[in-house]
Amino acid sequence: GAVWDFGGGWASQSASMAKPMIVSIAMRKARADKLQQPLPAEQAGQAEKAIEHSDNDSADALWDWAGRRPAYDALASDLGLKDTHSAPEKDFWSWTWTTPLDQLSFMHQLVRGDTTALTDAQRSYLLGLMGQVQDDQTWGVGFPKSGTVQVEMKNGWVQFQSTDNLWAVNSIGHVSGDGRDYLLTMMGRYPSFDAGKAYCNAIGDWVFRILGSGELQK
């Protein structure tokens, strides 16, 4: 399909948008170690909390269990995400670096299945979690809501108190139904979380309406 981007190569920190990749590296470890698939019970519970509720403690536990930076960077390499990597100065998932186009590629591989980095069962499991994000975190790609539309998504937000005090506010996901089937990624920095959320909602709403209107069809 067609790809439209504005500043798609711009790099910033992932914040909680990294959590789908954290669950991915945990699933890869479980498979490599021949453990329960797609995840052992304890890690499955952590994955559910990390994705559906954006629970940071659960993401921390999965990050530690799955192998931290080396495992994350190996997944990014296997997915062909050339501008996605851990932060050399901070061994913390929130500070991993990525770009909108890399996240678009990740979502494309996750949804369409054209990757060997994750099995079909792993992809299905992760998309299932991303389709159950709690309501108050379905802004951005998931705005507006509709009972006839399915959204698999994850948002991320963090304030850079040690640098410029701006907020990184990100949203990635897949929207299908009601005549639509598209992937959308948004990354930006804003003076406040509310400003970033409102901007992502505006883009999510605009893309949803435009792609249902036929205006961009060739």
Language model regions located:
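Active-site SXXK
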Residues: 11-35, 50, 184
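Secreted/periplasmic proteins that engage bacterial cell-wall peptidoglycan
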Residues: 1-2, 16, 101
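Mature, Sec-exported extracytoplasmic domains of Gram-positive
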Residues: 9-10, 24-30, 124, 147-148, ...
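Penicillin-recognizing serine hydrolase domain
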Residues: 64-218
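Short, conserved catalytic-motif segment at the N-terminal edge
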Residues: 1-11
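Conserved catalytic neighborhood of penicillin-recognizing serine enzymes
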Residues: 31-82, 99-100
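Short, hydrophobic alpha-helix immediately C-terminal to the catalytic nucleophile
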Residues: 23-27, 60, 104
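A mature extracytoplasmic/lumenal domain signature
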Residues: 8-10, 16-18, 54, 66, ...
